[in-house]
Each structure stands twice: as structure tokens, then as C-alpha cells.
């Protein structure tokens, strides 16, 4: 008989075998802070225009080469529970603003690093949390005073492109002016009078070959497909969209046909042909000259489409079908019935084109008032185009933020240094032990210009002391000059290096909330992970759509 070994008394006695339990400052708080610091240190070197790229290979063995913090974190699949909180804060920033995810990580990491110093010299966790919350509230009071300008006209391409440059610069340094112009053209062309801008209305089509400066904007949609039939170009297109295969009706039951004479054999397929002819003729009779289908195209149906001079395009993706319906104003029909006028879409031209060596079908609106705009990106490698696409997403999201709030604050560390200066002064006036936490909160803002300086290869301490001396003289808009070879500063407003007010507001709020949440944890209780076989890797799931 096996000997029963009693469990050690205490918390472990209540839990199943294999459960872990950590408590207290040393085991829980400092461990959590260490994990968050490591995470912030990872993405800190990727901050700003001179940030380094990370090469991430995810569990599906897909390669990512990027300095976009949101992508890095999404593919890393962080497991540590405290670090996950910081990751969730950065995801919230991405959902709310679409940019500034790395700011949240770097700032939250700095807050926790400085909180550890305070805890080690004897402050209690509650005093640190209280000080951080007071300082965060003060930062939000000061932030509106730091607004240096506002966007005047969001329908002016030149003005919009100058405002988008900063967000694109951090991802594609050197190409930001060209990309900002492309994104501005795409956004302005579909910006509705109501002011409700939808980021999903800007599509990206990536075509391998050439270089980034061969990219272009098109009002309408571009698909990497070839037309099915002989017709390759249609002007003033009337489009019928079908979500079903372009084929004759097939009965669900299997049948056996008994043929007695040669004449019956001759007439057997003729009836099917006549039926298909009548169906395609009826569709052509409504005025439709382009058919888009979401399924297979039968050879006989293709023959009659060519006979009635109808252009035929096949889209496997149901998402592409939906977007096309939105672009041309069509309704997707579930059966091969002739569409009524209200169900047909309209487009100025549909044509087959060749970009590089890739065949594309273009649905184009001549007037700049279409529902969807497409940016056609060119690049030498897939990884490069993926990274450019992420820069485009940031630019489009920045435009969306500007439609909500047109205020802008100076970039390049200028806003952070001014906040640090003013919050430090405020901390001096506060009684009680919270003042130490308030001053450390102000010091945490230095992490942003410090990261920019270190990534640019200049001495961070020299730059920060220069910034403080200039800001003490009242120059609120002066930030780090990342293009200078020596530590230098310049006016961010004159250089058009501007950040959105909303982006900064939410980043400070979310980073502080995440840091405070991590500090509030004094016990970690982890159950034993569930066993069981792992799902097979590399194989598709049984219910995934199979593309024909």
C-alpha cells in the first residue's frame, strides 16, 4: 500500500497537486515588475523612426520582420499573466487609436521600473498607486495646454498628408512623404459628408515586384484574379453579383437515366444547354454586362457568357464579394435569377490589367466619390510589403482619429518633457509620501525621448538635459532632432512632427492603468495546466473553407 504523504500546511493544502502559489513583495510584485520590464525592453529598441526591426517566427512558422509593437506582441503569444496585462493595454490602444502601442509598453515599463525603486526604499504599494493616479489625472489636465495646432481642413490632400507623416515615419522612415500622400488621397476621396469615416473602406492590394515608389491609389477595388471568359474590358458596367456557382441547377438526389435510342442520347444534353442559354440570355436581357460569382464556373455557362458578350469574374472569398457589393452598390443573389435594376451594381469601368507580371481585375470609379478606395502597394519582398501595409494601417487610423478630434501636440519627445517638467513642479507642492510617486511618474516620461535618442545613436543624457533647459525657457514645442549626428533639438511644430491629442491621452491613461493593475497584485495562484493531446500542427481544420 502506498504511503500517504500529507501536504505542507498553509495555502498549498487547499489546492490540487501541481498548483503554484506566490505571495508578498519579493515573490509576486517584484516578479511581475521584472516580467513587464523585460517585455518593455524588447519593444523599446523598436521605438521611433530609427527603431530596429524584430524578426519573429510564430507557431505556424510564418516570418515577420517588423518594428510594429502591436504585430510583435500579437505573434509572441505572451504567457506571463502580468506581462499579459501590459499587452492587453497596448491592444486596447490599437483598438481605440490604431497607433501608439509601443508608447504604452515603454511608458508602462518605465512606471513599473521606477515603482520598484520606491518600493525597495520603503514606500507602500498603496502610496505608489495613489501617487500614480494623482499624477495621471494631472497629466490629463496639462495635456490640453500643450496642443500646438489643429487640423483645419480634412478634405485638403496636402494638409492631411503633412499630418499623417509622423505616424508613418516610425514604420517607414525615408518613404513617409510619398506614403502619406497616397494615404491622404485615398482617405480624402472617400471621406463622407457626415464625417463618419470607416477604416475598412481603405483596401490594400499587395503586388510583388518593382519598388515602393511604384505604388498607386485607385478609386474602386483591385483583385488579384483573371477574368474567366473572353471579355476583358467593359465601360459603364452594370454588375450582377451571385454568391452561388455559375452553373446549371443540380438536383440533390442522384438519378439514373435509361436511354433507348440514339435520338434520345442526342437530345439528352441539349435540354441542359437550352436551359443554360435561357438563363444567361435572361440575365443579359436586364442590361447586365458583368457577372461576378462566388463559386465554380461551368464550361457551358462560360460559353454562353461569351456568346452574349458578358464579362465573367470569379471571387472565391466571401469577404471580397461583400466588399465588392459595397463598392458598386449591388446585392449578392443566392440563385441564378435575372437581377432587377435595384439589385445590380454600377461601375464606370471594369477591366483586366497587368501590374508587373500579375493579372488584376479592376473595378474603377472615375469620380472621387466611391465607397471604397484601394492602395496598390509594390515591393521587392512579401515581408517588406507586409510592413508597408502596417504603415498604411497606422496612417489610415490616424486620419480616423483626426476626424474625431482635430487637436495635435508636438512629437519627438517635446510633449513628454513638458509633462515631466510640469508634473515634477506639481509634485513639489504635494504633501505626504505620494509626492515621491508623482515625481517618479514625471521621470517615467523621460523614457520616451531617451528611447528615441538611444535608437538614433546619440547620448540620451545630453539630449534630455538640453530639452529640459530649452523647456525651462518656455519653448514647449521643442523636441529631439533625430536627423542630427550630435545631440540636438528643434521646434517640432516647424518641422511638422506632430502627434494626435487623442493618441497621447489614451496612451497615458492605458499605460498608467496597466501599471497600477500590476502593482495591485500581491498574490499569484496558478492551477496546474490541463493535460490532453495537442491539436495536430500544419493541417487545416476540417471545417475550413476549401478554395477551389
UniProtKB/Swiss-Prot annotation:
Keyword Acetylation: yes
GO biological process: binding of sperm to zona pellucida; chaperone mediated protein folding independent of cofactor; positive regulation of telomere maintenance via telomerase; protein stabilization
Sequence segments annotated as region (Disordered): 529-548
Binding site for ATP: 100-102, 170-171, 412, 499, 504
Positions bound to ADP: 47-48, 100-103, 169-171, 412, 499
UniProt-listed Enzyme Commission number(s): 3.6.1.-
Keywords: Acetylation, ATP-binding, Cell projection, Chaperone, Cilium, Cytoplasm, Cytoskeleton, Hydrolase, Isopeptide bond, Magnesium, Metal-binding, Nucleotide-binding, Phosphoprotein, Ubl conjugation
Matches recorded under CDD domains: TCP1_theta
InterPro entries: Chap_CCT_theta, Chaperone_TCP-1, Chaperonin_TCP-1_CS, Cpn60/GroEL/TCP-1, GroEL-like_apical_dom_sf, GROEL-like_equatorial_sf, TCP-1-like_intermed_sf
Chain positions found as N6-acetyllysine: 318, 400, 466
Positions bearing the Glycyl lysine isopeptide (Lys-Gly) (interchain with G-Cter in SUMO2) cross-link: 224, 254, 260, 534, 539
Covalent link location (Glycyl lysine isopeptide (Lys-Gly) (interchain with G-Cter in SUMO1)): 459
Assembly and binders: Component of the chaperonin-containing T-complex (TRiC), a hexadecamer composed of two identical back-to-back stacked rings enclosing a protein folding chamber. Each ring is made up of eight different subunits: TCP1/CCT1, CCT2, CCT3, CCT4, CCT5, CCT6A/CCT6, CCT7, CCT8. Interacts with PACRG. Interacts with DNAAF4. Interacts with synaptic plasticity regulator PANTS.
PANTHER family named among the record's database cross-references: CHAPERONIN
Function (record text): Component of the chaperonin-containing T-complex (TRiC), a molecular chaperone complex that assists the folding of actin, tubulin and other proteins upon ATP hydrolysis. The TRiC complex mediates the folding of WRAP53/TCAB1, thereby regulating telomere maintenance. As part of the TRiC complex may play a role in the assembly of BBSome, a complex involved in ciliogenesis regulating transports vesicles to the cilia.
Similarity annotation: Belongs to the TCP-1 chaperonin family.
The protein, known as: T-complex protein 1 subunit theta
Chain's gene name: Cct8
Amino acid at each position: 500500500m502506498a504511503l500517504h504523504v500529507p501536504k505542507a500546511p498553509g495555502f498549498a493544502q487547499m489546492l490540487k497537486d501541481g498548483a503554484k502559489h506566490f505571495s508578498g513583495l519579493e515573490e509576486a510584485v517584484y516578479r511581475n515588475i521584472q516580467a513587464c520590464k523585460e517585455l518593455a525592453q524588447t519593444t523599446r529598441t523598436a521605438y521611433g523612426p530609427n527603431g530596429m526591426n524584430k524578426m519573429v517566427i510564430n507557431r505556424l512558422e510564418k516570418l515577420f520582420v517588423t518594428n510594429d509593437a502591436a504585430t510583435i506582441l500579437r505573434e509572441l503569444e505572451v504567457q506571463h499573466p502580468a506581462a499579459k496585462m501590459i499587452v492587453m493595454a497596448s491592444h486596447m490602444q490599437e483598438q481605440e487609436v490604431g497607433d501608439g502601442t509601443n508608447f504604452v509598453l515603454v511608458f508602462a515599463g518605465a512606471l513599473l521600473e521606477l515603482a520598484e525603486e520606491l518600493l525597495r526604499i520603503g514606500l507602500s504599494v498603496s502610496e505608489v498607486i495613489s501617487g500614480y493616479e494623482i499624477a495621471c489625472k494631472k497629466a490629463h489636465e496639462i495635456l490640453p495646454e500643450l496642443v500646438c495646432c489643429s487640423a483645419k481642413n480634412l478634405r485638403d490632400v496636402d494638409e492631411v498628408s503633412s499630418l499623417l507623416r509622423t505616424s508613418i515615419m516610425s514604420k517607414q522612415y525615408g518613404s513617409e512623404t510619398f506614403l502619406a500622400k497616397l494615404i491622404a488621397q485615398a482617405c480624402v476621396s472617400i471621406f463622407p459628408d457626415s464625417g463618419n469615416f470607416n477604416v475598412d473602406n481603405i483596401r490594400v492590394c499587395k503586388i510583388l515586384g518593382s519598388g515602393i515608389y511604384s505604388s498607386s491609389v485607385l478609386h474602386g477595388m483591385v483583385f488579384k484574379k483573371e477574368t474567366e471568359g473572353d471579355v476583358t474590358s467593359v465601360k459603364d458596367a452594370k454588375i450582377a453579383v451571385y454568391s452561388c456557382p455559375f452553373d446549371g441547377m443540380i438536383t440533390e438526389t442522384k438519378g439514373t437515366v435509361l436511354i433507348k435510342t440514339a435520338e434520345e442520347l442526342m437530345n439528352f444534353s441539349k435540354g441542359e444547354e437550352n436551359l443554360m442559354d435561357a438563363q444567361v440570355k435572361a440575365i443579359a436581357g436586364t442590361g447586365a454586362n458583368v457577372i461576378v460569382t462566388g463559386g465554380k464556373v461551368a464550361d457551358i455557362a462560360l460559353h454562353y457568357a461569351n456568346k452574349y458578350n458578358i464579362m465573367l469574374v470569379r471571387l472565391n472569398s466571401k469577404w471580397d464579394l461583400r466588399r465588392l457589393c459595397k463598392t458598386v452598390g449591388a446585392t449578392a443573389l443566392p440563385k441564378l435569377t435575372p437581377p432587377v435594376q435595384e439589385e445590380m451594381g454600377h461601375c464606370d469601368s471594369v477591366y483586366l490589367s497587368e501590374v508587373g507580371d500579375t493579372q488584376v481585375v479592376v473595378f474603377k470609379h472615375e469620380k472621387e466619390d466611391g465607397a471604397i478606395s484601394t492602395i496598390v502597394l509594390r515591393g521587392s519582398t512579401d515581408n517588406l510589403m507586409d510592413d508597408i501595409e502596417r504603415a498604411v494601417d497606422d496612417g489610415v487610423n490616424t486620419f480616423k482619429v483626426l476626424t474625431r478630434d482635430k487637436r495635435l501636440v508636438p512629437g519627438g519627445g517635446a510633449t513628454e518633457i513638458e509633462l515631466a517638467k510640469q508634473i515634477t513642479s506639481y509634485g513639489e507642492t504635494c504633501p505626504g509620501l505620494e509626492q515621491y510617486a508623482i515625481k517618479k511618474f514625471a521621470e517615467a516620461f523621460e523614457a520616451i525621448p531617451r528611447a528615441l535618442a538611444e535608437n538614433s545613436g546619440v547620448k540620451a543624457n545630453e539630449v534630455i538635459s538640453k530639452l529640459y533647459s530649452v523647456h525651462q525657457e518656455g519653448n514647449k514645442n521643442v523636441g529631439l532632432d533625430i536627423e542630427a549626428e550630435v545631440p540636438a533639438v528643434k521646434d517640432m511644430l516647424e518641422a511638422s512632427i506632430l502627434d494626435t491629442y487623442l493618441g497621447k491621452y489614451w496612451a497615458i491613461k492605458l499605460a498608467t492603468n496597466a501599471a497600477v493593475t500590476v502593482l495591485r497584485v500581491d498574490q499569484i495562484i496558478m492551477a496546474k495546466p490541463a493535460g490532453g493531446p495537442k491539436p495536430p500542427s500544419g493541417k487545416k481544420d476540417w471545417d475550413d473553407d476549401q478554395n477551389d
